[in-house]
Design a protein with these regions (language model features):
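Bacterial N-terminal signal peptides that target proteins for export
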Residues: 2-14
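Generic detector of short alpha-helix boundary/capping microenvironments
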Residues: 12-13, 137, 175, 257
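Residue-level signal for mature regions of secreted extracellular proteins and peptides
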Residues: 18-19
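C-terminal motif of bacterial Sec signal peptides marking the signal peptidase cleavage site
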Residues: 22-24
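Exported/periplasmic ABC-transporter solute-binding proteins
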Residues: 26-85, 92, 96, 101-108, ...
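Periplasmic-binding protein-like
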Residues: 114-119
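A short, gly/pro- and small-residue-rich
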Residues: 131-139
Length: 313
């Protein structure tokens, strides 16, 4: 079974996305507080332009949607917004990015300040539906995360199970960073994978639990943790690595876990305010067009009976 795709394939596709970002996003997507999305230039890659996205009538007057989004969308969401604005130039979008729990706490305390909430799990939107009055929709799933075993120290050319097994057999000291499974679907998936591979009991003393997925990646990327279970989107979109400097070596530093070897990492959202305009963007986000871009950015598409994406076959 193949556990990793060639890095060149991923990065060729990611170069399309980076080109779109540089061409179409005038405001920085690294600002955690907010980013305004503007019309994308004609240099946007053909892959991000499709005829399969729904096109509703754009509001005649300019409207602003305020989106609260999980931090692992920081690279790809501005690209999607820029493409969305090709059809809906009168809908301006402001994005607030934050780690999963911090984002939930912010939105839950100030639901009137946001129109769409895009969480990193399914739990928080359900809680929002129960606790916030006047919510405008039921939770919806907008993407599915991919789990990888990542290391800045160790090259990995075999399966993730064999990699960790061999370290245990050789009695080598190592540490493994995992996001807190109490509030992060990525942590739940990582623990479940270890259990399924009969590794959890032996590796448990070596686990370092982190409060956020960003912290898990930072700890592993800095080498303070030898290994970490992170999202593929984080590895492909390393901070300060827009030039994709490690194209030739990065593929040896991560292994993609088979998607059927751990519980699905489903990321849900919910509409809080401005339901009509918000629904236009949500429909776009769930379209084949947007799901294709999300797939290139390291996510798995949400497949339906009519989805024609290769990843859905």
């Amino acid at each position: 079974m193949t556990f990793n795709q060639p890095a060149s394939n991923f990065f060729n596709r990611m170069l399309f996305i980076v080109t779109a970002l540089m061409a179409g996003c005038n405001s920085s997507n690294n600002n955690q507080n907010s980013t305004a999305a503007n019309n994308q230039s004609s240099k946007e890659p053909a892959k991000a332009i499709s005829t399969n996205a729904p096109v509703a009538s754009s509001p005649k007057a300019t409207e602003t949607l305020r989106i609260a989004a999980f931090s692992n969308l920081r690279m790809v969401l501005p690209i999607l917004v820029s493409d969305f604005n090709h059809n809906y130039p009168n809908i301006k979008i402001q994005i607030t990015f934050a780690p999963n729990t911090a984002l939930y706490n912010t939105v839950n305390a100030n639901p009137q300040s946001f129109d769409i909430y895009l969480s990193g799990n399914q739990t928080y939107p359900k809680q929002m539906l129960a606790s916030v009055k006047g919510v405008k929709s039921s939770p919806f799933t907008y993407t599915r995360g991919q789990l990888v075993l990542y290391s800045h120290k160790y090259p990995m050319d075999i399966s993730p199970t064999t990699t960790l097994d061999q370290l245990m057999l050789d009695n080598k000291p190592f540490s493994l960073a995992i996001a807190n499974p109490e509030n992060l679907a990525y942590g739940v998936a990582a623990e479940a994978w270890l259990v399924n591979q009969n590794l959890y009991n032996n590796i448990k003393p070596k686990i370092i639990y982190t409060n956020t997925l960003d912290e898990t990646f930072a700890l592993t990327d800095s080498g303070k943790a030898d290994f970490g279970f992170v999202s593929l989107s984080q590895v492909l979109n390393k901070p300060n690595n827009i030039a994709l400097q490690n194209v030739n070596t990065l593929s040896n530093n991560y292994l993609i876990l088979p998607k059927n070897s751990y519980p699905p990492i489903l990321q849900d959202g919910i509409i809080l305010n401005h339901p009509n305009t918000s629904q236009i963007f949500v429909d776009y986000l769930k379209s084949v067009k947007a799901q294709d871009v999300l797939t290139d950015a390291g996510f798995l598409p949400i497949c339906t009976s009519t989805t024609i994406l290769p990843a859905c076959k």
